[in-house]
């Protein structure tokens, strides 16, 4: 079989891998948008392969850096199905529509929606943790990974010349004991080949404190002591639900002061409905909370913002408050409005809770730049910028080592590191080598391997 790396090669975003069997059956694993530079944030117009010749697309999870170019793929001639877990199908309907509207020109909005709806018609939900026989040659198995609702590793078993070969695509590897979501599930078999993400391959999560303790400290300092506002940039799907759930849990424990919490992300409301629809994918505490209260994401002091007029009105709310708004990297969305209005406010704290790609405002803030350019205006940063990785859906180096550690070293013929910056990959590769793993590759974009 032939494996080609068309994305997430020596970078974090743009996951797209093409697997071709000995008989010529072609499977694309993920078809993500590339956010590494401003040019590549545009929809992909030309693929490095012929979409009409693909036989199958497998989607690890709904995040746009894994799914964002599926509508373009179908527009370019792909006629097959997109297989994924049931929650991934539901979340993709929200994320793809939102992404296409953001990327489309004003006069192309209607066409963009038609293109997304056409793509969504191809989605087929496959039961996770069960073998799914595609044909006599190919069997797939979705393994829940705890990164996002519905996120999975994809295990592919191929029968070639009377022999079985197994190849596992990690997707994004989640964390144990992450709020709201079930823990990652172990693969039913040890693969011959592993394609493994390495987002945090060079580091350990800094915080060992519980998420509630971190939030309590920041909220107390910002909203009680300084009577200011706390802005938390968060992706509408995933991080926002985790934050709201954590804040609700804190409210039930009496740990949140009586202040307004604005969730300014209309899509997050729909995302929350999807989470409550798929309760089996949540952890036991979340299931019990839903059973007791009938909701996970609605509580006293929570205000959901729907219109842009309401977004603007928040700037005239002068009491202490918490604002949760997307996007998490401050790379578009309503959070830009809140950040722009409050960068020079010394009583404001902006709490970054995850990775921000180069070229985004979030990345510049985390680098400590004294001035940020937004809407062609240089703004002095007087707000307090804080960072925690306790809400990151990605596991760290230790978690990645535990993930790889579940597999038989002797059976693993090759490990491909993807979805990480080069320095992260190098550090992870060195760690794997120290533990006795061999034949570890950091593929270049477009590089192909005969397996």
Regions found by a protein language model. Give the residues of each.
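Active-site neighborhood of phospho(di)ester-bond hydrolases with catalytic His/Asp-centered motifs
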Residues: 29-31, 54-63, 70, 82-85, ...
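Hydrophobic, well-ordered secondary-structure elements that form the walls
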Residues: 335, 415, 440
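Short, flexible loop segments at boundaries between secondary-structure elements
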Residues: 265-270, 276, 350-365, 370-391, ...
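Core dinuclear metal-dependent hydrolase active-site scaffold
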Residues: 1-52, 125-182, 309-316, 322, ...
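Pre-active-site segment of Zn-dependent metallo-hydrolases
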Residues: 9-14, 20-80, 84-90, 95-122, ...
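Metallo-beta-lactamase
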Residues: 93-151, 279-318
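Cap/insert and terminal regions of metallo-dependent hydrolase folds
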Residues: 176-264, 349-354, 372-435
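Hard-cation-handling environments
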Residues: 218-358
């Amino acid at each position: 079989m032939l494996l080609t790396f068309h994305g997430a090669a020596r970078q974090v975003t743009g996951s797209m891998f093409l697997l071709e069997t000995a008989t010529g059956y072609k499977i694309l694993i993920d078809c993500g948008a590339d956010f590494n530079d401003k040019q590549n944030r545009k929809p992909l117009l030309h693929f490095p392969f012929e979409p009409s010749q693909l036989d199958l697309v497998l989607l690890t999870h709904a995040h746009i850096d894994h799914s964002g170019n599926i509508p373009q793929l179908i527009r370019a001639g792909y006629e097959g199905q997109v297989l994924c877990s049931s929650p991934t199908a539901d979340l993709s309907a929200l994320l793809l529509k939102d992404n296409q509207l953001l990327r489309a020109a004003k006069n192309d909005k209607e066409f963009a929606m038609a293109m997304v709806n056409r793509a969504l018609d191809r989605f087929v939900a496959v039961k996770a943790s069960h073998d799914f026989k595609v044909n006599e040659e190919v069997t797939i198995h979705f393994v829940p990974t705890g990164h996002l609702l519905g996120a999975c590793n994809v295990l592919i078993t191929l029968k070639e010349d009377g022999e079985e070969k197994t190849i596992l695509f990690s997707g994004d590897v989640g964390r144990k004991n992450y709020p709201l979501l079930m823990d990652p599930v172990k693969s039913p078999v040890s693969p011959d080949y592993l394609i493994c993400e390495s987002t945090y391959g060079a580091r350990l999560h800094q915080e060992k404190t519980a998420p509630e303790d971190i939030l309590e400290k920041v909220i107390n300092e910002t909203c009680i002591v300084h009577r200011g506002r706390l802005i938390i940039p968060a992706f509408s799907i995933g991080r926002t639900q985790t934050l709201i759930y954590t804040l609700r849990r804190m409210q039930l424990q009496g740990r949140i002061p009586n202040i307004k919490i604005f969730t300014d992300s209309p899509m997050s409301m729909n995302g929350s409905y999807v989470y409550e629809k798929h309760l089996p994918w949540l952890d036991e505490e979340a299931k019990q909370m839903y059973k007791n209260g009938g909701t996970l994401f609605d509580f006293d002091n929570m205000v959901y913002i729907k219109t842009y007029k309401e977004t603007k009105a928040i700037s005239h709310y002068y009491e202490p408050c918490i604002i949760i708004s997307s996007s998490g990297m401050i790379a578009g969305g309503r959070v830009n409005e809140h950040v722009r209005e409050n960068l020079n406010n010394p009583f404001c704290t902006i709490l970054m809770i995850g990775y921000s790609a180069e070229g985004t405002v979030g990345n510049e803030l985390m680098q400590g730049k004294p001035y940020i350019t937004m809407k062609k205006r240089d703004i002095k940063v007087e707000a307090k910028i804080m960072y925690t990785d306790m809400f990151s859906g990605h596991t760290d180096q230790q978690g990645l080592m535990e993930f790889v550690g579940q597999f038989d070293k002797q059976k693993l013929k090759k490990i491909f590191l993807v979805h990480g910056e080069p320095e992260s990959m190098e550090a992870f590769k060195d760690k794997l080598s120290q533990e006795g793993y061999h034949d570890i590759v950091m593929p270049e974009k477009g590089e192909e391997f005969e397996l």
